[in-house]
Amino acid sequence: YEDKVVIVWFWELGTKGTSRVLCVEVPSGKVLWENDAARKYKKYGDDKLVQFYVHYWEDGNDDRDLYAELDVHTGEVYTRRYPGYNANVFATTIYKDYLFYGAEKGDAYVGAIDLRTHEMLDEVMIDFTRGDFNQIASIGVHDGQLYVEIQTELDHSDIHVLDLDEDE
């Protein structure tokens, strides 16, 4: 950001401490706010950081699974759960007003959350040839197309390209 830097840090696994987020004014170095809402955020717009993470559980998702939105001016965090949603979501990207994510639920899916309303849109299944690995490794947007990398083997990935409807 022009006048501030947001720093997210995580303690090393196995050590004692609390992961933190802090906002530092530039160039003074003054700490504007600090909290313990450390997540792997992505920048959205001029004043927000967002994250969507879900880990599949046989009994349904747990308390850590949610959408989180951090206001960079205040440090306040808005969270939202999607009751009944159960998948593995590790890869996300932001494009315009949408957070796109890759979801693993036995098959591979791509979904989106409208960042203005927080509505979860319908997911689309991706047809791919299975291997021994089968995980969504990355997701990104370029020139109006959504690219999804599915790692099917330890040393091989398939790239799937979906056209985005810019009017919807």
What are these regions (language model features)?
Residues 132-168:
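Blade-level signature of beta-propeller repeat domains, shared across WD40, Kelch, NHL, RCC1
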Residues 26, 72, 115, 164-166:
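Inter-blade boundary loops/turns of WD-repeat beta-propellers
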Residues 1-2, 34-48, 52-54, 82-96, ...:
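Repeated scaffold domains used in trafficking and secretory/extracellular systems
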Residues 29, 68, 75, 91-92, ...:
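Small side chains
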Residues 14-22, 58-68, 106-112, 154-163:
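Structural motif
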Residues 4-15, 47-61, 94-104, 142-152:
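Short beta-strand elements that form the blades of beta-propeller/WD-repeat-like
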Residues 30-35, 76-83, 119-130, 165-168:
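Aromatic (tryptophan-biased) beta-strands that constitute blades/sheets of beta-rich domains
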Residues 9-10, 36, 53, 73, ...:
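A structural detector for beta-sheet-dominated domains
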